[in-house]
């Protein structure tokens, strides 16, 4: 579904990504781990066209997207849940969700299904997002991404700043995507939580892929896990 082949990405004249390659299959959950500054968020930004790579190829659903604009990539079926949620604070929850609605060739979600996943949402619809807690904002951000009918969702630090109960709900939602045939690429500092839901894992270091393998292998091998990600 998603292929990233040997991309090089720069901020100005500073190179940040040095040829990482990865893939995410249809309905597959893939974790992308690594220390702060390893290049994980830049890789997501490259996929989304926000920081386009200078070389290499990115393809989605069989089509090259390396040179496409971000809005075109979204219309093709890639959703994004950024680390800062990026809800519109002065707009209501209902309006924020309405802005996410799109139809693609992938599964189309309904608002009632979002209420089934995040039950508090139904009672927050009239509230402005600036009055929400961090956990409530994350519910809005994830729901908005799903209402865009993606075949793939990119999650950037989905558990950041959330209470443990909300983290469980978020990870349960990511796991559910697999059952719905939706793929996910999950950047996450909470490595154990990510490994619990992922099928495969990549570990980045200094803009390169340092490790690739089944998530269960890294989860069960404490020595390797400590060496690669320090947990």
Indicate where each model-derived feature is located:
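Catalytic Walker B motif of ABC-type/P-loop ATPase nucleotide-binding domains
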Residues: 153-157
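Conserved structural motif at the start of ABC-family nucleotide-binding domains
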Residues: 2, 17-19
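Conserved ABC ATPase signature
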Residues: 128-132, 136
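The feature captures the beta-strand-to-loop junction immediately N-terminal to the Walker
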Residues: 33-35
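Conserved ABC transporter NBD signature motif
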Residues: 56-65, 76, 109-110
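ABC ATPase C-loop
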Residues: 145-146
């Amino acid at each position: 579904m998603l292929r990233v082949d040997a991309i090089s990405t720069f901020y100005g004249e500073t190179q940040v990504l040095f040829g990482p390659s990865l893939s995410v299959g249809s309905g597959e959950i893939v974790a992308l781990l690594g220390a702060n500054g390893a290049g994980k968020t830049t890789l997501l930004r490259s996929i989304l066209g926000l920081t386009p790579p200078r070389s290499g190829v990115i393809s989605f659903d069989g089509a090259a997207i390396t040179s496409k604009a971000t809005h075109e990539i979204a219309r093709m079926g890639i959703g994004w849940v950024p680390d800062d949620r990026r809800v519109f604070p002065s707009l209501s929850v209902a309006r924020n969700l309405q802005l996410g609605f799109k139809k693609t060739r992938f599964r189309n979600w309904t608002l009632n299904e979002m209420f089934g996943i995040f039950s508090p949402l139904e009672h927050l619809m009239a509230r402005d997002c600036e009055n929400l807690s961090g956990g409530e904002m994350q519910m809005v951000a994830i729901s908005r991404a799903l209402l865009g009918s993606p075949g793939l969702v990119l999650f950037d630090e989905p558990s950041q700043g959330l209470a443990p109960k909300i983290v469980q709900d978020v990870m349960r939602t990511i796991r559910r995507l697999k059952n719905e045939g939706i793929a996910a690429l999950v950047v996450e500092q909470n490595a154990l939580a990510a490994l619990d839901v992922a099928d495969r894992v990549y570990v980045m270091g200094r803009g390169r892929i340092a490790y690739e393998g089944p998530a269960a292998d890294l989860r069960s091998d404490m020595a390797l896990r400590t060496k690669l990600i320090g947990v």
